């Protein structure tokens, strides 16, 4: 799928992270937005999964928009693998999502709240999940999401690998990650500058009555 789309050279984060993840190691990957982080964790997850119809990997995202985006890219990356990649996120019909899950799923992409809801309702079994990934991990491990992430993690006794990817990793986030990572390999891209387009700035003076 990758070569057919014209991909010939991996980005730095892909070049550094994919071989390590393929070996089954836990990975903390840091690179700027737009550097190919999704493929960096998505390719090893796809390669490790089989079209069994049972959840083997789960990727958590902070927003439903990102969950949809990640799922679409994974679907593109898998090519003819035949994997079922499903999304679960809030703000949509939960019964419809439950029916979709019943048809079978190999890789799940979702938001923490809806994943927990689906699990507690019996629609999503996390016990056989072997690969666990946090996208935008800096947001996923802040104080707002951390309890939910930890709850989900505790439902995965079969977990073999944890992948964390983000553009930034404050020290408190790295400390939180120690709760559920096993001797992770840190992959930090050298190209972390934020690309900011040129912006025309101007000022408008208004009278005191306004």
PLM segments and residue spans:
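Short conserved AdoMet
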Residues: 22, 50, 102, 157-158, ...
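Short glycine-rich anion-binding loops that position phosphate/pyrophosphate groups of nucleotides
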Residues: 34, 113-115, 138-139
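Walker A/P-loop
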Residues: 25-45
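Conserved nucleic-acid-binding Ia/Ib motif block in the N-terminal RecA-like helicase ATPase lobe
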Residues: 4-7, 53-120, 128-131, 174-178, ...
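Conserved phosphate-coupling serine/threonine residues in phosphotransfer and NTP-handling enzymes
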Residues: 11, 33-35, 62-63, 111, ...
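Interdomain coupling/hinge region of P-loop NTPase helicase/AAA+ cores
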Residues: 77, 86-88, 97, 125-210
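Conserved pre-motif I regulatory segment
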Residues: 1-30
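Short hydrophobic/aromatic beta-strand immediately N-terminal to the Walker A/P-loop
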Residues: 28-30, 58, 163
């Amino acid at each position: 799928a990758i070569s057919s789309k014209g991909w010939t050279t991996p980005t730095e984060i892909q070049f550094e992270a994919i071989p390590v993840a393929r070996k089954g190691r836990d990975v903390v990957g840091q690179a700027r937005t737009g550097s190919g982080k999704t493929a960096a964790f998505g390719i090893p997850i796809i390669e490790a999964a089989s079209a069994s119809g049972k959840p083997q990997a789960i990727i958590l995202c902070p927003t439903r928009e990102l969950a949809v985006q990640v799922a679409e890219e994974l679907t593109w990356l898998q090519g003819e693998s035949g994997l079922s990649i499903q999304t679960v996120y809030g703000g949509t019909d939960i019964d419809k999502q439950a029916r979709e899950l019943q048809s079978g799923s190999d890789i799940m992409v979702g938001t923490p709240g809806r994943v927990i809801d689906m699990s507690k309702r019996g629609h999503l079994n996390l016990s056989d999940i072997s690969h666990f990934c946090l996208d935008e991990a800096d947001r996923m491990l802040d104080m707002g999401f951390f309890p939910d992430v930890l709850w989900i993690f505790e439902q995965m006794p079969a977990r073999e690998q944890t992948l964390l990817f983000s553009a930034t990793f404050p020290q408190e986030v790295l400390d939180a990650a120690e709760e559920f990572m096993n001797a992770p390999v840190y992959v930090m891209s050298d190209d972390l500058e934020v690309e900011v387009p040129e912006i025309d700035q101007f000022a408008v003076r208004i009278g005191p009555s306004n």
